[in-house]
């Protein structure tokens, strides 16, 4: 098990459903599950390659950046990436990832995405999550004229590859 995998396991075991995690989510008005959809370099690289033609040379705002791996890979294609993450439970891993490989064109912002409206603007806003899909889409549209629901696109292209709950989240949007 890699160092990051071990850290993720510790976060899942300690924080998911804890009183402090639930209180934080309520206090900040976020709906964040302690489940990452991009948790390794392979997944992040594949998603970034999928998005590359639409983000090349552009400013990207990633909503719900988790531990920041996708943002790092997006930075290989985009001119600038702003990664916004509201859930502090990922902060230990986030710091580890940043210390190892953060490039200058990728910035990380900690807080609910709506806190940065009017401050951060992009050409493209993306979200790659199963948490609060509808809310993520609504806030993403306020950051950029082009919004990409990464898993929405992937599920639409190959619905049989995803479980019923992932498909149902997109049917409600």
Residues of each region from the PLM?
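S-adenosyl-L-methionine
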Residues: 1-54
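Class I SAM-dependent methyltransferase core
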Residues: 62
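Conserved SAM-binding loop of SAM-dependent methyltransferases across substrates and taxa
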Residues: 67-77
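Conserved SAM-binding motif I beta-strand of class I
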Residues: 80-85
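Conserved SAM-binding loop
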Residues: 94-95
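Conserved SAM-binding strand-loop segment of SAM-dependent methyltransferases
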Residues: 103-113
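A short SAM/SAH-binding and catalytic strip from SAM-dependent methyltransferases
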Residues: 123-135
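C-terminal substrate-binding/active-site "lid" region of AdoMet-derived donor-dependent transferases
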Residues: 134-173
């Amino acid at each position: 098990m890699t160092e990051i995998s071990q850290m993720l396991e510790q976060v899942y075991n300690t924080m998911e459903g804890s009183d402090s995690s639930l209180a934080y989510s309520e206090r900040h008005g976020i709906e964040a599950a302690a489940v990452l959809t991009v948790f390794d370099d392979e997944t992040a690289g594949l998603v970034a390659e999928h998005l590359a033609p639409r983000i090349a040379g552009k400013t990207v705002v990633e909503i719900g950046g988790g531990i920041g791996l996708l943002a790092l890979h997006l930075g290989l294609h985009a001119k600038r990436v702003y990664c916004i993450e509201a859930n502090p439970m990922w902060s230990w891993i986030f710091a580890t990832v940043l210390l190892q490989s953060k490039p200058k064109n990728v910035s990380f912002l900690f807080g609910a995405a709506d806190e940065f409206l009017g401050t951060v603007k992009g050409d493209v806003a993306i979200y790659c999550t199963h948490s609060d899909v509808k809310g993520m889409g609504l806030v993403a549209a306020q950051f950029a004229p082009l919004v990409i629901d990464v898993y929405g696109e992937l599920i639409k292209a190959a619905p049989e590859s995803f479980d019923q709950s992932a498909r149902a989240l997109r049917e409600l949007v």
